[in-house]
Amino acid sequence: MKKIFFAIAISLLLINSYAQQKVCVAFYNQENLFDTINDPNKNDEEFLPEGKYKWNSERYYAKLNNMAKVISALNPDFLGMCEIESIHSLTDLISTNALITSNYQPVFFEGPDERGIDNALIFKKAMVKEARGKIFTINPEGLGGDKTRGILFANITLNNNEHIYFLVNHFPSRREGEKESEPKRLYVASVVKHICDSLYKKDAKANIIIMGDFNDYPNNASIKEVIGATGDVKAMPTNGFFNPMYNLMEQGKGSYRHKGEWNFLDQIMLSHNLVDCKTKVCYKTNSADVFKQEWMLETEEKYKGNPLRTFGGMKFLNGYSDHLPVMLYLDIK
C-alpha cells in the first residue's frame, strides 16, 4: 500500500510540474546596437566604419557576442529591448552562437526616432502560439516638434491560449535636464496609459506588461501618477499597475548608476490580473530583480562596480551596456 501511495504521489508531482511553467520576463537596454551599414534615413553616421566610433565589423560582432553572452546567462523567455537600430542588428543578435539554439523570434518595427534606434521584443518560439505586433508612434506636437521612439505593442497568445499584451518603451532622455525634459516623458506616459485603458475597456482582466527604459524613476510623476504604477499591491487601482522595481529601489538596488548612486530607469510593470493570480498567468511574488554578474561590471578603480559599457568616451571598452537587465518570473499554468 505504501509503495502504491508513493507512486501516486510521484505521479501527481510530475503532472503538477508539467502543468506549471516558470517563465522569465526581462528588459535590457542594448546601448547603441547599430549595424555597420549606412542608412540615409537615419542619423547613424557615428556608428559606421569611417564614423566617430570606428564602428567596423570587428567591433560590431564583438558587441553582438557580448550582448548575447548576457542574454544567454539571463535566459529570458520574453525579452524587451531598446536602442536597436535595425531588424538586421536584431536578427544578427539572435543568430549568434550563444542564442541560436533558444530559437528566439523577433517583434520589431522601424520608428521615427531621429537617431534610428527602436524597441524590440524577442520570445522563445516554443512558448508562443501566435504573436502580433504594431508600433504606436508619438505625435511630435506633444514633444515640442521632436521625434522619438514609438511604443512597441505585442499581443502574445501563449500555448495555454492566455493573452499577454507587452508595451516596450524608451522614453525621451534627460539630456536637456530632468525638469526641462519632464513634459516629454509625461506626454509619452499619457499615450501608454491611453493604450492600457483601451485594453482594460475591452477586457477588465487583461494581462498587460509595461516595460522599458523610462528615463524616470519609479517615484517620478510619469510612472507613479500618469501610468498609475505603485509598489504596494494593496494600493493598486483597478486599472493601475504593480511596479516591483519601486521596492527594489528602496533596497538600494538599481539598473543604472549615476554619480555613484543606483536607481531604476529600467522597469517592468504588471496589470492587476497578473498579481491577483486568479488566472493561468501569475506573477511569482518577490521574483523581480536586477541581473548583475561580476563580469558585467567595471573593474577600474575610478568606475568600479559600474556597468561595463561599450565605450568609455572614445575608448572602446569591449563591454556590454551602460544599463543592467531587469527581470521577474511568471508562473504559467
Predicted regions and their residues:
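Bacterial Sec-dependent N-terminal signal peptides
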Residues: 1-22
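N-terminal, active-site-proximal structural segment of metallo-dependent hydrolase catalytic domains
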Residues: 18-103, 107-111, 117, 296, ...
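Active-site beta-strand/loop signature of hydrolases that rely on acidic residues for catalysis
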Residues: 28-30, 67-90, 122, 166, ...
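Extracytoplasmic/secreted cell-surface and envelope-processing proteins
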Residues: 35, 88-91, 115-118, 175-178, ...
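Second-shell loop/turn segments in exported
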Residues: 52-58, 75-81, 108-109, 140-141, ...
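Structured beta-strand-rich core segments of catalytic domains in phosphoester-bond hydrolases
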Residues: 84-163, 167-172
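Metal-dependent phosphoester/phosphodiester hydrolase catalytic core
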Residues: 159-190, 194
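Metal-dependent phosphoester-hydrolase catalytic domains
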Residues: 198-208, 216-333
